[in-house]
Structures are given as C-alpha cells and as structure tokens.
Amino acid sequence: MALRGLIRQSKVRRRREMLPQQVGFVCAVLALVCCASGLFGSLGHKTASAGKHVLLDTWRNRKLMAPINGTPLAKNCTDPAIHEFPTDLFSNKERQHGAVLLHILGALYMFYALAIVCDDFFVPSLEKICEKLHLSEDVAGATFMAAGSSTPELFASVIGVFITHGDVGVGTIVGSAVFNILCIIGVCGLFAGQVVRLTWWAVCRDSVYYTLSVIVLIAFIYDEEIVWWEGLVLIILYVFYILIMKYNMKMQTFFTTKQKSIANGNPVSNELEDGNDLYDGSYDDPSVPLLGQVKEKPPYGKTPVVMVDEILSSSPPKFTFPEAGLRIMITNKFGPRTRLRMASRIIINERQRLINSANGVNSKPLQNGRHENMENGNVPVENPEDPQQGQEQQPPPQPPPPEPESVETVFLSPFSMPEAKGDKAKWVFTWPLIFLLCVTIPNCSKPRWEKFFMVTFITATLWIAVFSYLMVWLVTIIGYTLGIPDVIMGITFLAAGTSVPDCMASLIVARQGLGDMAVSNTIGSNVFDILVGLGIPWGLQTMVINYGSTVKINSRGLVYSVVLLLGSVALTVLGIHLNKWRLDRKLGIYVLVLYAVFLCFSIMIEFNVFTFVNLPMCREDD
C-alpha cells in the first residue's frame, strides 16, 4: 500500500499540471474522427446502397420511416440514442451553427470532473477499504484498485444498457481497452526519456487472460444479443482472475523456476541454505524471517530503470540489519506515512546499488554481515595482516545517496489560489467543480475525515454516476450533430476522454523509472473493463431487472472491432517480444501506428466501406 500511495500522490500532483495537454489530445481525437467520418461516410454510402438497395440519396436526409404510397415500411436506419435523454436546449440547426462547441466544452469538463473524483476521493476511499479488509497487494489491485481506474467506463456501460439501449457503452469499453494497450504504451515509450525493461511474467499473465476474455466476448456478441448466462460467465471469469492474482507470487516463482531450469539445462533448486522448505515466493510476505540466508542469485543487469516489483519480490537479497528494518516498517503494523517513507527509502537504496554496480563498484558482503558502500554509512575494516591488499581492493568512497524525495500531500481546496499565472487560470476554470466536491464529499485522505471513508466511497460513487450520465449525454449530442454513430463516439472520443488521465499518470510513473509497473497495470485493468464493465450491466439486466430478457447489440461492426482488439493485443505482445522486452521509442512508434490503424479500420467498418454492416443513423429535420 505504501508504494501505491507514493505513486498515486505523485500522479495526482503532476496530472493537474498537464491539463492543457489532456484537453488538446482529446480535441485532436475528436477532430480526426470528424474528418474520417466525413471521408468514409461518403464511401460507405455506395456500399450500403448496393447492398441494401437504399432508396434515399444521402444518409443525412434519412427519416425514421420510409413510407411508400402511404404504407409505412420497416426502418431503414438506426434510431439515435439522443432520444433517450432529455431534450437539448438547442435545436440541431443551432448546434450545427456553433452551439455544439458548448457541448464539447461540457464533455471535456466532465472528463476532468471524473478524473478529480476518482483520484482525490474515490481511490483513497478504496485504499482505506483494502486496509480494513487486510487484502494483499495483488488481490486489492485486481479488485478495488482496478475499479478505481475503470469506474467511468463501467458507468458508461451501465448507461448504455439501461438508458440509451445502444452500443455506446460497449464501444467505450472496447475503445478504452485499445487505448490502454496501444496508446498508453506508445506514449510511455516515446516520452519516458529512458529505456524501460519489461517483466515478462506480468505482461504474459495479463495478456493471456485478457486474450481469453476477448475471445469469450467475441463468441457472446457474435449473434448480436446477450442472454443471462453469458453475463454470468463474464463475472465468473473475473472471479478466477482474482484467484490468479491471489496466488500470483507462487505461480511466478513456479514458472520462473521452470524457465531457468530449461534455459540452463539442469534443475534449479530453490531450497534455503538453512534447511527450510522450498522458497515459494513468500519472501514478499512481511511475516517471513527477513535475515535468513538464501542462495546467491545472479546480479541484476545494468539498466537505468529500477524494477521495483522484480527487485522487491522476484530476487530476495541478503538483508542487512538496516535493510531488514526498512522491510519491517513497510508492513501493515505501521502507519501509512511511515510505510510511504520507508518504501521510498528502499527504492532509492536499490537504485543507488544499481548505479554503483554499473560504475564498477560492487557491494560485497563482509564477514560481520555488513556491505561495502552501504547507504547507512558503515565503512568496512581493512585486513591488518595485508594492508596493501586492502588498499587495492577497497573502492573509492561513494557520496551518500540523496534523501528520498518528499511526496507532498496535495489536497483539493477551493480557498487557496496558486501563485503561477497558468495555475491561476486552471484554478478559476475548475473552481466550481472543486468547490462542489469539497463541500459534498469528505476527503478521507485527511486525518480528521479518515474514519468516514465509507461516506467518501458512497458520495464519490454517486458523483461518478452523475458525471458519467452527463458525459454520455453530451457525447451523444455531439455525435448526432456531427453525424457520427454512437459506436464510433464510444470507441474514440469517450474512450480517449476517460482514459487520457490514466495515460498521463502512466507517463508520469514511467518518467520516475516505474514504467514496467505502468505497462502491466494498463493491460491488467482491461480485464476489469471487459469482464466487469460488461458482465455486471448485462447480468443485472438479464437476471435481476428483467429475468430472461436479452441485451441487443445494435452494431454488427462492433464484432469486427473486437476482433481488431484481439489482433492488437497479439501484435503488441509480439512487438514487445521482438524488441527484447524493452519499452523504448521504437516500440512506442510501433504501437501508436497500430492504434491509428485500429481507429481507421473501425470507422471504415461502421460506415460500411468494406461490406454492408450497419444501417445508418436516423436523421430528422430540426
């Protein structure tokens, strides 16, 4: 929890500084979608006309019914989801003449509001719940913390099932999944400023299970309707994923041992030298002895990035007394602030050790259990019988490492204006939102409100539901005004708006040297999006609210988009493997190109460019 708190507070502090970049990126995505829709819409009309013998000339002039000789025929278009929401203050003509800009600004404001609620209120309350339930790091990350980052997509899916009765929710889930895999990895690779070596186990574990989830989703939506047992299967699959995360360390140790055994041609023993049982990965459990003697492992490779998970979990070192004290102080027996400081201390110590190793200065164990060049300032004693040998072998003294960077806890406050001019403008722009949230939601990150974390959880959930409804409503109006189908708006604009904050946060984490954690978490969060983000709304509709009913999938092209999603996962993992499990600029450009190709093909499929897939959206003269 301490390391997660360190990362989250750093993300919250820096994400607000990147608000212009986030707004610019989302606006650029909307502009590209408008251009692509205008281009592919004209191409798709010819295919649709040839395939269905549509009588009308253009899609924009379609009516809800196409009567011939006064006899109404079946609809030759798809009902827009805009009619499921309250009537807009502006007519369609007024929106086309400029009023749609107000809706775009409102949607951007809702994106930012969701990011603020999730980061500053919802996620801290989830952390408190995990602490009270004494959940392990892996189980908490797979359940509550995954819900914290994917709540906007979940509520968008709920609104799509129960309110719009359309595909905007499914489109948002699919688009967000592709965005998380391709765009976030690409941005981290381009702008991290360093080469990040990825851990094969985390990527393979989440990618394999995510591939299974996508295959199941394709099988379920292929017939364009969802029945009760299909939603139940998705939920059960997520329960199995939680079990996998619960026994993650044991599985990682098992497969890592098998891999080393195959690579070396001989079996690898994990037995402890003091006669204990097999070392099954329990070294990450704070309850095990911290000063036990274990067999030597090969030294870490020379890399500018500290693999925190790998260092603290996969390769147990010989702990000295100060190091063991730090390990003890990150357990649940100590307060959150103490654990946060000790976790940052461990990270800096390990990074300094890698830097010393890269410079040719090795930390050698001494007979008295101390290490040379230790951060605690201990100096080894030379052998008095051979002073010259001691002088030759003793490396030059190293300066003490810098103190851990203090992570200043930043709380939202509508009553403190920042000093910088740019920050003042953003503060004025977001002041109504900050004031509303601070008045209605107790901030359980503050000590005085810490015991009210359940109140924070409930009120934050209500605000997320309200903001998600407004977000989907505004995006639906924008799509109807610009002639963009709901599925495309979900795959592109909604997905980008709900995922760009996570993208910026992952970039911040990657710049701090924790890119491996950021990449593996993006893939793992997609499992939650598919299995829970779709399984819960579908299950509620077909088993609770209206038992025996079905959920209709209106867009046939959505099946092809999910197939493209499956292909993007396979190509991404293949690219990571061919790049020798390194995240750099070359891999970043590769996955961003894949994301652009996915968007182009998804838009072309929805507009019937290749073959007839969907009826166009119904238009009205207003």
Swiss-Prot record:
This is Sodium/potassium/calcium exchanger 4. GO terms for molecular function: calcium, potassium:sodium antiporter activity; calcium-dependent protein binding; calcium:sodium antiporter activity; calmodulin binding; symporter activity. Expressed in late secretory-stage and maturation-stage ameloblasts, with significantly increased expression during the late stages of amelogenesis (at protein level). Widely expressed in most regions of the brain, including hippocampus, neocortex, thalamus, striatum and olfactory bulb. Expressed in the olfactory sensory neurons. It is a multi-pass membrane protein. Residues 39-97, 164-172, 222-224, 479, 548-557, 608-622 are extracellular. Its main location: membrane. Residues 119-142, 194-200, 246-457, 501-526, 579-586 are cytoplasmic. The keyword Signal applies. Calcium, potassium:sodium antiporter that transports 1 Ca(2+) and 1 K(+) in exchange for 4 Na(+). Controls the rapid response termination and proper regulation of adaptation in olfactory sensory neurons (OSNs) which subsequently influences how odor information is encoded and perceived. May play a role in calcium transport during amelogenesis. It comes from the Eukaryota. One of its GO terms (cellular component) is plasma membrane. It comes from Mus musculus (Mouse). The keyword Isomerase does not apply. It is found in: Cell membrane; Cytoplasm. Residues 394-404 have a biased composition (Pro residues). It catalyses: Ca(2+)(out) + K(+)(out) + 4 Na(+)(in) = Ca(2+)(in) + K(+)(in) + 4 Na(+)(out). The chain crosses the membrane at residues 98-118, 143-163, 173-193, 201-221, 225-245, 458-478, 480-500, 527-547, 558-578, 587-607. Residues 1-38 form the signal peptide. Glycans are attached at residue 76. Residues 358-408 are annotated as: Disordered. Alpha- repeats lie at residues 139-179, 495-526. GO terms for biological process: amelogenesis; calcium ion export across plasma membrane; calcium ion homeostasis; calcium ion import across plasma membrane; cellular response to high light intensity; cone photoresponse recovery; detection of chemical stimulus involved in sensory perception of smell; drinking behavior. Belongs to the Ca(2+):cation antiporter (CaCA) (TC 2.A.19) family. SLC24A subfamily. Disruption phenotype: Mice have a reduced ability to locate an odorous source and lower body weights. The olfactory sensory neurons display defects in response termination and adaptation but have unchanged sensitivity. Mice show severe enamel defects. InterPro entries: K/Na/Ca-exchanger (IPR004481), NaCa_Exmemb (IPR004837), NCX_ion-bd_dom_sf (IPR044880). Keywords: Antiport, Calcium, Calcium transport, Cell membrane, Cytoplasm, Glycoprotein, Ion transport, Membrane, Olfaction, Potassium, Potassium transport, Repeat, Sensory transduction, Signal, Sodium, Sodium transport, Symport, Transmembrane, Transmembrane helix, Transport.
